[in-house]
């Protein structure tokens, strides 16, 4: 059974984020995530605090942070504090980094740093002593436990890393074919580490637009494949063409560039190169019946959580339709 989540772009008023979070929990969404890009948008952790005190059961986290944007001990302290505030409802979503670093002219971090950061955060949140930068430290007050860790990735190496260290993996598209391709590497990483792949949770994250008007629906979400293209550009510089599926890479050939000041923005010129075919594969567009059909395809591909990037407008209506018509049909 697929569980449902939402992700906010933190450019909304805090009061609106609280309102939508409460509505989402009421409508059956079990997770509330938020982007972490502190220059482009508001800082996520105060907003997660508001989300925590205004919900009862919803699990919460950043989707995603990275090892380079904050000292690892700060990330651990933030999560451990929020775990106490929320009653142990925090998760950690983490990747190598994109907009929060690139907007400052920095590059994504290494997988070695990602792995080390995850272990540091786990240990500190569990109250264990560690040696950090040659100094023994311990957060003795951290008593709410380790947050589950979701690792974001696209390429074989990052996906194997997710299988090695993650409680879950974050895949930013809703294409069952690409998800199956990704999961083979997650499985390899898990098996190489002696872990049970079947226990690793799988998130498909993408925007949706429920409408019979496909032209409007596609235009509302066209920004998303453009966002994904930033990661694809990085991939094609690291791998040989035959190592990557053309369904993931071919669409960027007409990409002219990307302006992070219009990151994840409806109607952005960043998305001018994105075709309808790519939109239809990467996102969920169309009437309720089509949404349900696509979600069942994702579940068959191995997805355990579908995470709606709730930032395309008419957010209340999307939550209402999903809560009343889509989620019940998928459970």
Descriptions of predicted regions:
Residues 2-15, 65-73, 143-154, 208-211, ...:
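Active-site mouth loops of central-metabolism enzymes
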Residues 4-8, 32-34, 59-63, 90-94, ...:
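Hydrophobic faces of well-ordered beta-strands that scaffold small-molecule active sites
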Residues 107-139, 179, 184-300:
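An alpha-helical appendage that flanks or caps ligand/catalytic pockets
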Residues 31-54, 66, 98-101, 173-176, ...:
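Glycine-rich, proline-tolerant flexible connector loops at the mouths of alpha/beta enzymes
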Residues 28, 51, 82, 121, ...:
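Conserved, mostly hydrophobic/aromatic
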